Amino acid sequence: MATYAIVKTGGKQYKVAVGDLVKVEKIEGEPGTAVSLAPVLVVDGSDLTTDAAKLAKVAVTSEIVEHTKGPKIRIHKFKNKTGYHKRQGHRQPITVLKVTGIK
């Protein structure tokens, strides 16, 4: 089995391995900047680590590839019999990360 980790960022958890591209909630920083993510669980072959003391020694490093926006979400508010319609759209800012190491 390959080495992978479950990391938490932006209130969500992601399964990552070295070389993966991951789309996460926006993280401040320029493209090319190194970012360290906090692991929640690490699997190395058949060895599973969830102990907080051991996870404090583990670092999941990644690099910011680009900043982009997610898909368009359309909001439509409507009130009956009054002719009230309100349309609005939203695109969530996201950051694409490339995982460079699990140590």
Curated annotation (Swiss-Prot):
Pfam families: Ribosomal_L21p (PF00829). GO terms for cellular component: cytoplasm; ribonucleoprotein complex; ribosome. It comes from the Bacteria. It comes from Rhodococcus erythropolis (strain PR4 / NBRC 100887). The lineage of its organism: Bacteria, Bacillati, Actinomycetota, Actinomycetes, Mycobacteriales. This is Large ribosomal subunit protein bL21. GO terms for biological process: translation. SUPFAM superfamilies: L21p-like (SSF141091). This protein binds to 23S rRNA in the presence of protein L20. Keywords: Ribonucleoprotein, Ribosomal protein, RNA-binding, rRNA-binding. NCBIfam families: L21. GO terms for molecular function: rRNA binding; structural constituent of ribosome. Part of the 50S ribosomal subunit. Contacts protein L20. The gene is rplU. Belongs to the bacterial ribosomal protein bL21 family.
